């Protein structure tokens, strides 16, 4: 499949007729020998209330007897049996190149913030593309410094890797993604592509306006398929955004950041489509090809020689159950996992990252250095010991602990609070400016706390500050 200008995809004259409509599933009959291939886009016009609009369908199955089963990517109001359907002769194509930056698109690549005639792009790429060949891949192990203490110290991100943000509803996944977009745009430049998959329309609007306000929109393309869209659209929006990102990586030779919010909605849409197509469900009602669908998306999000796509994916965990097949299938593809914890968020500690369950494959001396690794392990040991003592404290009280354990508990509470940090995107709510903490300062600050150098400071001084000097200043204000 090659890139084309929009007008050069030779339109076919093959037309069919709608034979059956069941919700978003449409069966279309074509002439003998003219069946469109799987994934081809079909177009039909409907008139409703005096207004004519185009509906796009995507071929999903060949049924026999010259029938294809397609999934509608638009609301299907107005579709009727016997209506004419045109085979476009190609899969869905989306615009690529510098012209997409600063604009909002739907899953079909249609701009939502400007008229299509004003979009200045020369090429359109099909959204169904093969993953890079094995000999083109490059495994990067360079750390991506975010300036967020808890992430840089305990779950360091890989430049060119896949990062998962796991958490239930309302623990801060979208806020953390917005924060990462802001930090990376401010500190690294480069191109970002955001895919809003099945999330709230309000959140999409907020994100667009915030990015406009912060001046990062000109280097970002946004692709949305929101909650009210048909399942076919929600299933394809991530592929549309990924195709735009692949162009920047492969043609313009740039490092790209791809944000997907929320990958669970991609799985959910696949489940809905699978049920509509009559497939037998598998575990917990998910589609039988769950791992295959996830693999087709994730294998394209990769680094090729010299250029990378770094992806950050928010992953909703249904009922906080990490054994659910949807989040469990995603785990296998990730280089780092950041788990957001409800108990931590209830303490008012943000970002609510669980330091004991979050992981990274590069938290290893050969990648991050011996000092970073040792400090991270000491922090985890203190926090783990504090966690183990909580039942004893709840039953007997903290006074019954040994002197050594009392010191560990008090130190752990300071570490917990010092893992919190003000966000740039939350400035308007908290009234406190966000802060970027260099990695060297993060390591030195946590090492000093673990060594007991700041045991004399009150716990509250460590909450929502940047480096340790800010905690000392806050302690002086609290004591005055």
Curated annotation (Swiss-Prot):
GO terms for cellular component: plasma membrane; proton-transporting ATP synthase complex. GO terms for molecular function: ATP binding; ATP hydrolysis activity; proton-transporting ATP synthase activity, rotational mechanism. It is an enzyme of class 7 (translocase). It holds the Pfam family ATP-synt_ab_N. It catalyses: ATP + H2O + 4 H(+)(in) = ADP + phosphate + 5 H(+)(out). Produces ATP from ADP in the presence of a proton gradient across the membrane. The catalytic sites are hosted primarily by the beta subunits. This is ATP synthase subunit beta. It comes from Thermobifida fusca (strain YX). The lineage of its organism: Bacteria, Bacillati, Actinomycetota, Actinomycetes, Streptosporangiales.
